[in-house]
């Protein structure tokens, strides 16, 4: 993320608690009025067409007003698989263009990319600050307010699957028009002052501010992201996964701006924690509304993943955000069938992003302090997530969670989870507790290699007598998960210090030696059991990571 997005405040004029607020020029006021007028007439195709035609023409950025951003968010929920008749009625002459929902989503993604790049050489600085203001106004409107009851209070029933599906969306409560919408710009009339729904769907900001609906949206998205049921998967894949990714990015941008400009500098640690507890990400995670945050967060973020549920597990109820999302209209014909590999990759990437946002919040908490709300402690979250990952039954899902390409962006939490997960697995498979300091040693290649050598020689990555007591499949699964954790940590080691720092060092060669010898032991174990298939091997991957090709590490 470009620092200019956070630091640029040349045109900012704080108002009503919104430090980021930017006043309108006459030119932008005319554009805002025109877009709102088209929305009042439900001429959504023209709204989208106007915005689409602005891209790539010049350096002038067509700034989208925050109320139209909320309209685009809601339009994005109108996927044709369950709304095709309504979409056709609104846009009857569309025989070649994409649907309104896909066009709205693409526009949101394009504008978000411009916002994150914040390139003042490409666009006028005033336009960029005004665009930031509009997105921040929208995300502050979407932020769930404190409620008298929440999702966590709903009745939970015993279940073996971890999730219970309810068929219908929640009933929309009556709206108090005075409390539904407040336009900070009194120079024009917003369409949202007169409209609460878009083609039958209540405005997304109003829907998500209903009690329990914000967390239900997240759970509905995560649970359906791995579904085999076509309408449920489409609901997640076409609507809520891309929308939730946008929301997480916006909350992250808003958080950075809040810390930079809305928290007084040089305040005491106690006062800083108090302000941090009021920050956008804190409010975001407070929507979980639970006292036992670490365990419940782990349960929620891995909802519907394949892992061993605790014996006292209770099902988490979820329901459609909008009515009809769990059905397919007769006129819609699915054209794409996604593989389990694709589903796992997309689903686990989103879950990882959600976890990363939680750790981004926790990184700001000073040592010796804890957030007031939500009551999160970093060590508890690491342990809860690591415990769940260690109990995964699906190695594909496990790999897709850890094998990320964004090493730099996720370096502040993925190594901790890899080490924590490895520790939890070893706790279950070894006769003694193994204390790991691999993350501490990531900046010291020699110490890291020495620790790995010790773990390998202690048979932490070998098939042991305890493995023989379990089934072959379970033993192999545990070994594969241990291998993945080690490979993740090795990737970060090489990312942080570079291959050259330890290339051909005595400790590196000894580590490769120990791993190759360990692989030999795995083969002997499989041969002794007459299994026929080769067990998972670690050395071929590690040697490739360290650039060992023609070299041979001789086993004594």
Swiss-Prot record:
Keywords: Chromosome, DNA damage, DNA recombination, DNA repair, Nucleus. Pfam families: Nse5. It comes from the Eukaryota. One of its GO terms (molecular function) is ATPase inhibitor activity. Present with 907 molecules/cell in log phase SD medium. It comes from Saccharomyces cerevisiae (strain ATCC 204508 / S288c). Acts in a DNA repair pathway for removal of UV-induced DNA damage that is distinct from classical nucleotide excision repair and in repair of ionizing radiation damage. Functions in homologous recombination repair of DNA double strand breaks and in recovery of stalled replication forks. Its main location: nucleus. One of its GO terms (cellular component) is chromosome, telomeric region. Component of the Smc5-Smc6 complex which consists of KRE29, MMS21, NSE1, NSE3, NSE4, NSE5, SMC5 and SMC6. Interacts with KRE29. InterPro entries: DNA_repair_Nse5/Nse6. The lineage of its organism: Eukaryota, Fungi, Dikarya, Ascomycota, Saccharomycotina. It is found in: Nucleus; Chromosome. The keyword DNA damage applies. The keyword DNA damage applies. This is Non-structural maintenance of chromosome element 5. GO terms for biological process: chromatin looping; DNA repair; double-strand break repair via homologous recombination; regulation of telomere maintenance.
